Amino acid sequence: MIKVSVVGAKGRMGSHVVEAVNKAEDTQLALALDADDDLTQVTTDNTDVVVEFTVPSVSLNNVLTLIGQGVDVVVGTTGWTDEKLTQVKSAIANGPKPETQKVFIAPNFAISAVLADYFATKAARYFESAEVIELHHPTKVDAPSGTAIHTAHGIAEARKAAGLAPVPDATETDGGSRGQVVDGIHVHAVRLRGLNAHEEVLFGNAGEQLTIRADSFDRTSFMPGVLLAVRKLAGDAPAGLTIGLDHFLDL
């Protein structure tokens, strides 16, 4: 059995993770911790893998503390910048087990979203234009989503590798309606009551358009991906920092 601790256990995502861990046949809940709990309770004696699902303002400190405890970490919290990732890599290198420490960060755990992102990177080289639209519930604290940023980076890298020119755009005045530009790709965020987590990637050429869309209607859609990451970290996942569930899928 894989002993799993959950940080953020009372949150919207964390509570679903606790339920999923309890239901799975090969995992057991070790500790369920929340905002006021001491993370140094999590040790290699009681935990094989810890799942961290909190908010961007505290996630980095949580992950650094857990690395210091020597436990492997699955991170579902979004809002990761290059600067934060550099701190994680440094913590691993200077932690108690630099050669074997595993940290996994997922922009999205939904299989549909991971596949949509993968398909988008494959399609990007064939289209002159590309834009990303992400749509979420109004209680989400970051915008654009980590998934959308990850998708935009992937599209930009694929376009660069193919030698494509910048996306055409004759806009001269923009009060913000064109969205955030991520590596030359416009990313738009919608926050609307009734939504959960959705993403559309639009590709265009003269006379044609390709739309790739992923919809997660309920948070249970993320649980297979979370459990996959837990099993991989408890098994044959490489040491160090890994970003993206696509690394654990046969794509």
Swiss-Prot record:
It comes from Bifidobacterium longum subsp. infantis (strain ATCC 15697 / DSM 20088 / JCM 1222 / NCTC 11817 / S12). GO terms for molecular function: 4-hydroxy-tetrahydrodipicolinate reductase; NAD binding; NADP binding; oxidoreductase activity, acting on CH or CH2 groups, NAD or NADP as acceptor. The keyword NADP applies. InterPro entries: DapB_C (IPR022663), DapB_N (IPR000846), DapB_N_CS (IPR022664), DHDPR_bac (IPR023940), NAD(P)-bd_dom_sf (IPR036291). The active site is at H136, K140. PROSITE patterns: DAPB (PS01298). Catalyzes the conversion of 4-hydroxy-tetrahydrodipicolinate (HTPA) to tetrahydrodipicolinate. HAMAP family: DapB. (S)-2,3,4,5-tetrahydrodipicolinate binds at H137, G146, T147. Keywords: Amino-acid biosynthesis, Cytoplasm, Diaminopimelate biosynthesis, Lysine biosynthesis, NAD, NADP, Oxidoreductase. This is 4-hydroxy-tetrahydrodipicolinate reductase.
